[in-house]
Amino acid sequence: MSDAAAPEEQDELSGGSVQELLPGLQRDLEAEVIRGFIANIAIYPVLLLYFFGTFAYVTRNVVPYEFIDEQFHIGQTITYLKGHWFTWDPKITTPPGLYILGWLNYKVLKPLLKSWSTLTILRLVNAFGGLVYFPLVVLRPIFLFNAISFWPVALMSFPLMATYYYLYYTDVWSTIFIIQSLSIGLTMPFGLSKSIWLSALFAGISCLFRQTNIVWCGFIMLIVVERQAIIAKQFNTHGLNNYLKLFIHSVEEFQTLVLPYALNFVGFFLYLIWNRSITLGDKSNHNAGIHLVQVFYCFAFLTVFSVPLWFSKNFLRMYLERTNRKQVQVFFEIFLIMMVIRYFTKVHPFLLADNRHYTFYLFKRLINHNRRIIKYGLMAPIYHFCTFVYLEILRPSELLFDPISPLPIKDPNLLPVQLTHISWTALILCTFATVVPSPLFEPRYYILPYFFWRLFITCSAEPIWGEIVPGKSNEEPVTISSTSRLFLEFVWFILIDIVTLIIFVRYSFPWASEAFMQRIIW
């Protein structure tokens, strides 16, 4: 669904089953949706057995003790369980959302699971959230809205988040609450006003788990206002004019569309005044700065995780053709990336001192290699390609408009889950705003940039390696489908999950300062 305004695609926007792409070439959208539903229904129970079985094994046999940051998170939750609500560990840098949720979870489950340890019960918070609540409550409504673009069973298996289903970290519920906000903002299940207030509430709650979620709260607000303004103000191809229409509509409908989210910004501003910093606790090791190369780290991770979505002969050919066609421009783009590597790479002491994370090995052996041919000559072109992937995979999913005629859709709730040129720009800016200030090279920080990017991607139906050959005029049209790519995305995530789990289970080493064996995670 790339060009919603094109006349030949009005059938698709209004719910048509077969989409004619070219003479002799079509997509059967209804068949793709049915296959997607069947696959998700069949895979989900097996996935639950795998993840909960793995959870039991890891918790009992691999790390039946507090692991890395868990010592702070578990300790603070136990402090709350003891009733010491105003005692705070100064080494903790995130708000108390996880500890309040953990306290509630413990109070509910401990009477039912008396023989279970406190550690296991608290870890169940993330296991339940990621494996049950996230796919069924958060992702399912968007899937029903846009079933040919992603599978919930794949996104719940996303490796950067699935790792923390076994541990007591803030990332799972931070993601759940902010994506819940987006889900409600897109689908409006309770009517316009109630849905927006509920969406804003979930966005605000998510900030109790990670402060930078306030940025994504702003993005969700823009999405909500934009989807209403597209219809009310009849967006067209005049880009700057659409910005003005969006602004006018946000002012006219401030109380309904903007105020609920604006209250979150007011609360966050008061928090900054009170705390004098975005970081709680250990501010000395988490000073914000300009770490521009983080953007390329993020794009590189997203490119690797999205291989099944973009990889094809045609996509690679498109990159090479652009490189050949714009050689001078590409040269300066790569030169600019080299300058970013040279002057905007921050080496945090934690990164070089902690060999329990993949980033330690990636940074030491590849990203910051002492040979310049690798650090600059290899990594700069890689970052250039990854940036191309990030931008180009979104381009076919952009919602386009006609210069004169308005969209055939009259109800904002029926708009496809696509970005316009405005929200497309906002997504990039929000990604910059969340990753650039961080001094730490932490893949966990790329979870939300990934989900906000992935949920707006319309999966390609192009064959991965073959060529599309439309049927002849006297033959049945050739039907292409995105089902195989969506299935491969799920398989790709599961393979990464299994490999990282094997490394986590099989490879251990001692630390002089720790009583238990240490292991490697993201």
Swiss-Prot record:
Which residues are listed as membrane-spanning?
A: 36-56, 119-139, 142-162, 172-192, 205-225, 254-274, 292-312, 330-350, 373-393, 421-441, 446-466, 485-505
Residues listed as glycosylation sites in the UniProt record: 275
Associated pathway: Protein modification; protein glycosylation
Q: What class of enzyme is it?
A: transferase
What the entry lists under InterPro entries is as follows: Alg10 (IPR016900)
Q: How does it sit in the membrane?
A: Multi-pass membrane protein
- Keyword set, alphabetical order: Endoplasmic reticulum, Glycoprotein, Glycosyltransferase, Membrane, Transferase, Transmembrane, Transmembrane helix
**One GO CC term on file:** endoplasmic reticulum membrane
Q: Which reaction does it catalyse?
A: an alpha-D-Glc-(1->3)-alpha-D-Glc-(1->3)-alpha-D-Man-(1->2)-alpha-D-Man-(1->2)-alpha-D-Man-(1->3)-[alpha-D-Man-(1->2)-alpha-D-Man-(1->3)-[alpha-D-Man-(1->2)-alpha-D-Man-(1->6)]-alpha-D-Man-(1->6)]-beta-D-Man-(1->4)-beta-D-GlcNAc-(1->4)-alpha-D-GlcNAc-diphospho-di-trans,poly-cis-dolichol + a di-trans,poly-cis-dolichyl beta-D-glucosyl phosphate = a alpha-D-Glc-(1->2)-alpha-D-Glc-(1->3)-alpha-D-Glc-(1->3)-alpha-D-Man-(1->2)-alpha-D-Man-(1->2)-alpha-D-Man-(1->3)-[alpha-D-Man-(1->2)-alpha-D-Man-(1->3)-[alpha-D-Man-(1->2)-alpha-D-Man-(1->6)]-alpha-D-Man-(1->6)]-beta-D-Man-(1->4)-beta-D-GlcNAc-(1->4)-alpha-D-GlcNAc-diphospho-di-trans,poly-cis-dolichol + a di-trans,poly-cis-dolichyl phosphate + H(+)
Query: Which Gene Ontology BP terms does the record give?
Result: dolichol-linked oligosaccharide biosynthetic process
Q: Name one GO molecular function term.
A: dolichyl pyrophosphate Glc2Man9GlcNAc2 alpha-1,2-glucosyltransferase activity
Per the entry, what this protein does is: Dol-P-Glc:Glc(2)Man(9)GlcNAc(2)-PP-Dol alpha-1,2-glucosyltransferase that operates in the biosynthetic pathway of dolichol-linked oligosaccharides, the glycan precursors employed in protein asparagine (N)-glycosylation. The assembly of dolichol-linked oligosaccharides begins on the cytosolic side of the endoplasmic reticulum membrane and finishes in its lumen. The sequential addition of sugars to dolichol pyrophosphate produces dolichol-linked oligosaccharides containing fourteen sugars, including two GlcNAcs, nine mannoses and three glucoses.
Q: What is this protein called?
A: Dol-P-Glc:Glc(2)Man(9)GlcNAc(2)-PP-Dol alpha-1,2-glucosyltransferase
Q: What organism does the UniProt record list as the source?
A: Candida glabrata (strain ATCC 2001 / BCRC 20586 / JCM 3761 / NBRC 0622 / NRRL Y-65 / CBS 138)
